[in-house]
Amino acid sequence: MLFLAPGYIFPHVATPVTVAIDFAQAVKEGAYSFLDLKASPVPNPELFQPPSRVSIGMTGGREERNEEIIRGPLNYLLSLPGKDIRGKLIDALNEWFRVPEDKLSTIKEIIVILHTASLLIDDIQDSSQLRRGNPVAHRIFGVAQTINSANYAYFLAQAKLADLNDSRAFDIFTKGLLKLHRGQGMELYWRDNLICPTEEEYVEMVSCKTGGLFYLAVQLMQLNSEVTVNFSSFINLLGIIFQIRDDYMNLQSGTMTKTKGFSEDLTEGKFGYPIIHSIHAAPNDQQLIQILKLKTNDEVIKQYAVRYIESTGSFIYCREKLDLYLQEANETFQGLELLLGPSKGIRAILNFLRTR
């Protein structure tokens, strides 16, 4: 997830040099992979005036080269194709919202930047080796440079809010990032202290971590739309389905093995959904907890762990819960269609989430 909650948009510098920040081309080329919050005015609305360029304290002719260096890890990950489920969701929702194209492009850029930055930090926090089938950024650029690039990216995304010309966007953005950090913080706490959460605690965490970024996009879209329907429940459901499916695929999918490594959640010591169920299904058996504690790369041990999870009925349970959540999401979707009309894009996303 995310690493640093951002503050104000433009730092005050003695001799600022204007550097254009434009991710639109990357978005167009597809080069990258819940709570209702009442918005309030930003501390200083003047910070939101166009043009949407970032002033940074660098002088002379080196700023362009320096910008490439600073953004190196970010640009590296942007260049690796991903599923782009968030971009597809934004496009699908816009069948209802009808956000103007320029505003929609800005919102996509913001979400792409935030998601990519969060992956840079995720991979460091999880000691990951692969991302999208390639070496993680910090193995190439180093940990310190990657952290700095990710943090820099949060402010790039924040600066893009000016293009929306709505001071409420700052409040939505800030509260959204706080929520994302809360979810990530709890997941890291459970992992590092070897505390297995309950299913309810897991769902609450996912609502912050995964569903939170989905809903941030929705809130920014609704600033530029006449549609005022509350989407929080539906988006929350999509986030839960997406994360449970991801946890399931991590332990069961050959495709996931190629892109992230075999059963990477076991190596990370992560309490994914099937693992949580398996531990609670046999609370007096310490085998799985001990394997998580090892954070092992040993495939023999990980294969045994997968068989153990299977033996507790946890994969069956996971599939059954996914079906229930998908049924609820489909019923909610049908209600939204009655209000707003059909959406082929949302239906396609729901169909995608059914595949395993």
Curated annotation (Swiss-Prot):
Q: Which reaction does it catalyse?
A: isopentenyl diphosphate + dimethylallyl diphosphate = (2E)-geranyl diphosphate + diphosphate; isopentenyl diphosphate + (2E)-geranyl diphosphate = (2E,6E)-farnesyl diphosphate + diphosphate; isopentenyl diphosphate + (2E,6E)-farnesyl diphosphate = (2E,6E,10E)-geranylgeranyl diphosphate + diphosphate
Query: Binding residues for Mg(2+) 3, per the UniProt record?
Result: 246
Gene name tied to this protein: ptmG
Which residues of the sequence carry a binding annotation for dimethylallyl diphosphate? 131, 209-210, 243, 250, 260, 270
**Would the keyword Magnesium turn up in this protein's UniProt record?**
yes
Q: Does the keyword Cytoplasm apply?
A: no
Which residues does the annotation say bind Mg(2+) 2?
122, 126
**What is its EC class?**
transferase
Cofactor(s) needed by this chain = Mg(2+)
Q: Which residues bind Mg(2+) 1?
A: 122, 126
Residues the record annotates as the site (Important for determining product chain length) are 154
InterPro entries in the record, alphabetically?
Answer: Isoprenoid_synthase_dom_sf, Polyprenyl_synt, Polyprenyl_synt_CS
One Pfam family recorded for the sequence? polyprenyl_synt
Its protein name is Geranylgeranyl pyrophosphate synthase penG
Cofactor binding, per record: Binds 3 Mg(2+) ions per subunit.
As for family, the record states:
Belongs to the FPP/GGPP synthase family.
